[in-house]
Amino acid sequence: MSDFKVETKCLHSGYTPSKGEPCALPIYQSTTYKYDTTDEMVQLFDLKAEGYFYTRLQNPTNDAVAAKIADLEGGVAAILTSSGQAANFYAVFNICEAGDHVVAASTIYGGTFNLLAVTFKKLGIDCTFVDTDASPEEIAAAFRPNTKVLFAETIANPALVILDIEKFAKVAHEHEVPLIVDNTFATPVNCRPFEWGADIVTHSTTKYMDGHAVQVGGAIVDSGNFDWDAYGHKYHGLTEPDESYHGVIYTKQFGKKAYITKATSQLMRDLGSIPSPTNCFLLNLGLETLPLRVERHCYNAQKIAEFLNAHEKVSHVNYAGLPDDKYYPLAQKYMNEGRTCGVISFELTGGREAAVRFMDSLKLATIATHVAASKTMILHPASHTHRQMNDEQLAEAGVSPGMIRLSVGIENVEDIIADIEQALKNA
C-alpha cells in the first residue's frame, strides 16, 4: 500500500481479507501448524518455502502486524520482538559478534546504554559513545577497523535531542557500516528515517504504537538499501554459508530481505523473544489510531511546553517544538510539520528536591516508568530509567539531576495544565 497516506496504511496495511474472511485481524493463538506431507515440512525447515511451522519463528498474526510497520516505515521487511530492548539487541547482534565494535550516540535510553556498554561487552562486542551534536569528523574518529554499526535515536529519551540523521548516515556509509535508528519517540507518523539515509529502524512498540500501556513489544525494520554483499568481508554472517541452516547464504537466497530473514530464522530460533499473537493483536489495535493519537499528543505537548517555558519556577524546557529550542531547526527538517512527540523534559529552579515535591503533588498525572501512553505520566530519569548510570554517564546522556520527564497524554490539555500549575505551587 505504498501509494496510500499514513492514516490509511495504519488501518489497512498488513492484512487484506478475502471474501468471507474476518474484517478484523484474527488472533492465531497456536504454537504449531498442520501439513499433509513430510516433504512440506522439509521445505520449510530448509528455508526453501514460505510458511509457518512454529510460532517462535513466525505466526500469521505477528507477520501481518510486522508487514504493517514495515509499510509505515517504507521498509522491505520487518520482524516483531517481545520488547523494544529485544529489538535493539537483535538489530545489533544480527550483524555483530565477539571482537566487533559499535559506535553509538550517547544521548539514548538508559536501558539501551547499558545494553551497549555493559551487556554487549560481556559478549565481546565493544561500544564507543559519541556526542549526538559531534561533528562528522568527531564521530568518524570513534570508528575502528572492526566497527560494524552506528546506532542512535531519532529523538533521544529523555534529553529529547533531535538526531541529524543525514549527518550520521553519511559518516556510517563512509565507513561502510549501516546506521541503525531507534524511531520509537517520533514514530513513522512524524519521521521516516529511511528517507534521510538510515538503513535499519527499531521500535519499542510498547510506546506510541500501542498507545494504551497494555502490551510490551518491539520491531525491527530493514530498508533493504544497505548492500551487505559489497562489504561481505565485514558481514560474513549474511554473505557466507550459515552452517546452522544447511549452508544457506542469506543475501543470495533472500536478497533485500536477507537481514530480517537471518534475524528470524537464526536469532529467534536460538534466543526466542517472540511476542504472543494476542499482544500483536493489541498492538494492531493501537496502530489503527496511531496518527490520531500522535496528533493530539503533540498538540497537547506543544501547549504544555509553552506554559512551562513561561513559568517562573521552570529553569529550562527541552522540547524541539519551541522556537528557542536548540533542536528546533532539526525538528523542522526531519519531522512531519515540525512535530516531534508528546514527551517533554524540563527542570525546576529548585533542582532535584523541587522536582520531587512537584511530582508528589500531581493529581492527574501518574508517576510511572512508562512513556507515550494515552494517559499523562511522569518520572525522574536520574532516579528511575537512568538510575544505573553514574554522574559522568548521566551528563553524557543529557540527564541532569533535576530533570523531569513528562509524557503528555491525550486528556484535555487544560486539565493537564491545571494539574501541573497546582503542583508547581508546592515545588
For every predicted segment, state its role:
Residues 7-16, 78-310, 318:
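Conserved PLP-enzyme active-site core in the AAT-like
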Residues 74, 146, 313-316, 364, ...:
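Glycine-centered tight turns that cap/initiate beta-strands
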Residues 37-89, 111-119:
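Conserved N-terminal alpha-helix of the aminotransferase class I/II PLP-enzyme fold
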Residues 1-59, 67:
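N-terminal "arm"/small-domain region of PLP-dependent enzymes with the aminotransferase-like
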